[in-house]
Amino acid sequence: GKGERLHPLTQYRAKPAVPFGGKYRIIDFTLSNCINSGLRQIAVLIQYKSHSLDRHIRYAWNILTPELGEYIASIPPQQRISEDWYKGTADAVYQNLFLVDNEQPEYLLVLAGDHVYKMDYAEMVNFLVENNADAVVGAIEYPIEEATRFGVIGVDQDHRIQQFDEKPEHPTPMPDDPTQAFLSMGVYLFKTDVARKYLSEDAKRNTKHDFGKNIIPRMIQERRVYAYRFQDKNMKAVKYWRDIGTLDAYWEANMDLVAVDPLFNLYDQTWPIRTYQGQFPPAKFVFAQDYQGGRMGVALDSIACGGCIISGGRVQNSVLSPNVIVQDYAVVRESVIMENVVIGEHVRIRRAIIDKDVIIPPNTEIGFDPEADRSRFTVTDSGIVAISKGMKLDAPIHTSV
């Protein structure tokens, strides 16, 4: 999709290419799951504003061995079947069935590139085989009162899917817990011949050409389709899966990373999250001689990536991408600051998302006056302020540190 709910972060890039967690892109989490699960033939279907995503895949994910038949390849619309672009998630796969035919795999795994979670897809394949299923949908338990925003799965005692409702007004509860609903994670595993049949038939119908709205609901009437209960490799008390399709969800997911014991663990070396490693110097924190006057470069409960210079400013509960500069007496709280942002002297920022290449002039305040913020920036209903990439603010700024 176009990622319109994540605007302005998707103004110049596809949603999976949006920076996340300081040094990553959103798609890195799905691709890391693939590699950690032992998958080695991966096609990334790209369409809208794809340059940034395509470049990231080439730079960050050129890690496999083509001589062994391994690859991660970005595939734009080929127009082999018609002159149409991808008309939906199912149509995107249908238009690229020639790739599947070339490889002739026994199973076809279809994933969303804009979710954050850790999952071993090999375990899902084992589940499909054990249940002699034609298809399996990854599912996670979720409070039933919050499930109306997602695709909800109704299952029997054996987890065979009985119904599939997209954003229902009254979600179906789980059979063993009426306070929980089963949500679709956007993870679909098929026997390849079954997927080919239903995708080909759907292409001839007047539908949305969507897995959740069309393919799966039709399959559960005719085939053995099961829900696979998400086994989280994040290893926390509460399972972690986030669809970060809105600014609020994006901000909240970044804030999940900065606690002393973060909800999502980036530091588990048994399940590494891979990305492009830019050649940046170490982060630097300077000026400690004037603590009483507030001139102290410090970052608390925060992530600061390579190349960052906290030069007499204070950062708290925030995520800083590479090469961010925070100057004297500036204060940044509960914010996501992307690459090459300069934050001037005496600036105050709270609950903001600032995209790349923005210079914040001295004495600017962001996140304190909703009306003033709305006149210049995007502000969500919950008060999160989003500033687009390269936005020019009025006053000049001194960038020496």
Where are these regions (language model features)?
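Left-handed beta-helix
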Residues: 193, 201-401
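Unchanged
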Residues: 1-258, 373-390, 400-401
